[in-house]
């Protein structure tokens, strides 16, 4: 072999300098999420975090999630600013259903070719989501993997750890006949059902940037960041006895509400009691999607469902609306041995 060419990692498609530039870009926004329990700074081999001293019997709660094919739509439309918020929301909203306070968050960002501006936009969104939920962004991994992803396409995953007092874990065991169900409104499809969203766009030959809905581009509705409920729900838990919380994600109403119901109970909902944001009506019509499929795929305007005693329902409703949530009484718990765990009356 006579060729004396000296190959570098950059020749192979991995730009270490770009990775370092990204770290420099995000240091400031990451620092703003710091909690007093966090020890050390960004860049260590492992992140250290103490448990808050207020807990007598602290139980750690963990979760991981992604953003699904909402990423594909964001990449196609070159809108990346809300994706980081979505990522945090999917994790911390899962944690808070057990009554847990999120402590820290880590992210994984993988791409074929690192675009510093895009990655910085996503991670800035992650930091914003952490600020909204009160957890610290303590670290992450940026993986530039040529040949694994097409060009600047990327994927993200999030990992969150929270803590709850052992005696205050919310697990659905208190749910009983007569409990009232309160819904907290969603900001849109959140981060679920986007394979169907994209199919509807293609099926109806719709350009989400030029199609208007309620005076703004359809893309604004579809890429609205997932609402983060953590602080308002933690405040509610301190003031009323919450029996169960369901986060409406993949599987919609039919699969998520039963996850927190005891045996021999049934959730009976009144469809007219809450508002469907316009984007759901548009999708149902444009894709000729059945009512059953809408409720199985999307949150249809409901991000969280909270079960509590009828005596606490009015107070909880007032607290949530005063805190800035859109909240409605949407149903009740009934005793039932039916396999149909959720009934939605039109």
From Swiss-Prot:
Keyword Transferase applies: no
Localization of this protein: Cytoplasm
The protein's name: Phosphoribosylformylglycinamidine cyclo-ligase
Database matches in InterPro entries: PurM-like_C_dom, PurM-like_C_sf, PurM-like_N, PurM-like_N_sf, PurM_cligase
Any one GO CC term of the record: cytosol
Classification via HAMAP family: AIRS
One example of a Gene Ontology biological process annotation: adenine biosynthetic process
Alphabetic keyword roster: ATP-binding, Cytoplasm, Ligase, Nucleotide-binding, Purine biosynthesis
EC numbers on record: 6.3.3.1
Gene3D superfamilies attached to this UniProt entry: PurM-like C-terminal domain, PurM-like, N-terminal domain
Reaction(s) catalysed (UniProt annotation): 2-formamido-N(1)-(5-O-phospho-beta-D-ribosyl)acetamidine + ATP = 5-amino-1-(5-phospho-beta-D-ribosyl)imidazole + ADP + phosphate + H(+)
Pathway the protein contributes to: Purine metabolism; IMP biosynthesis via de novo pathway; 5-amino-1-(5-phospho-D-ribosyl)imidazole from N(2)-formyl-N(1)-(5-phospho-D-ribosyl)glycinamide: step 2/2
Gene: purM
MF term (GO), any: phosphoribosylamine-glycine ligase activity
Family to which the UniProt record says this protein belongs: Belongs to the AIR synthase family.
Major subcellular site: cytoplasm
């Amino acid at each position: 072999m006579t060729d004396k060419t000296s190959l570098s990692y950059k020749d192979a498609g991995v730009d270490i300098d770009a990775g370092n530039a990204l770290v420099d870009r995000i240091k400031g926004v990451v620092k703003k999420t710091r909690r007093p329990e966090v020890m050390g700074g960004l860049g260590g081999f492992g992140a250290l975090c103490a448990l808050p001293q207020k807990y007598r019997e602290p139980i750690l709660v963990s979760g991981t999630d992604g953003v699904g094919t909402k990423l594909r739509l964001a990449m196609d439309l070159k809108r990346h600013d809300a994706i980081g918020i979505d990522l945090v929301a999917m994790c911390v909203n899962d944690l808070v259903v057990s009554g847990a306070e999120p402590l820290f968050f880590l992210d994984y960002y993988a791409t074929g070719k690192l675009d510093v501006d895009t990655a910085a936009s996503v991670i800035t969104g992650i930091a914003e989501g952490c600020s909204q939920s009160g957890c610290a962004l303590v670290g992450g991994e940026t993986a530039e993997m040529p040949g694994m992803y097409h060009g600047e396409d990327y994927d993200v995953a999030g990992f969150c750890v929270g803590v709850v007092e052992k005696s205050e874990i919310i697990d659905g065991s208190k749910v009983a006949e007569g409990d009232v169900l309160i819904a907290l409104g969603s900001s849109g499809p959140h981060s679920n059902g986007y394979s169907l969203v994209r199919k509807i766009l293609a099926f109806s030959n719709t350009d989400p940037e030029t199609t208007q809905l309620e005076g703004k581009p359809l893309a604004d509705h579809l890429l609205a960041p997932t609402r983060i409920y953590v602080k308002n729900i933690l405040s509610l838990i301190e003031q009323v006895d919450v029996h169960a919380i369901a986060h409406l994600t993949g599987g919609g109403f039919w699969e998520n509400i039963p996850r927190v119901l005891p045996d021999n109970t049934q959730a009976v909902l009144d469809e007219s009691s809450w508002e469907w944001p316009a984007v759901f009506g548009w999708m149902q019509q444009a894709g000729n999607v059945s009512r059953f499929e809408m409720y199985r795929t999307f949150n249809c305007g409901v991000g969280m469902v909270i079960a509590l005693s009828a005596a606490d329902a009015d107070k909880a409703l007032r607290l949530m609306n005063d805190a800035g949530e859109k909240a409605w009484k949407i149903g009740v718990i009934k005793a039932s041995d039916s396999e149909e765990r959720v009934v939605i009356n039109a």
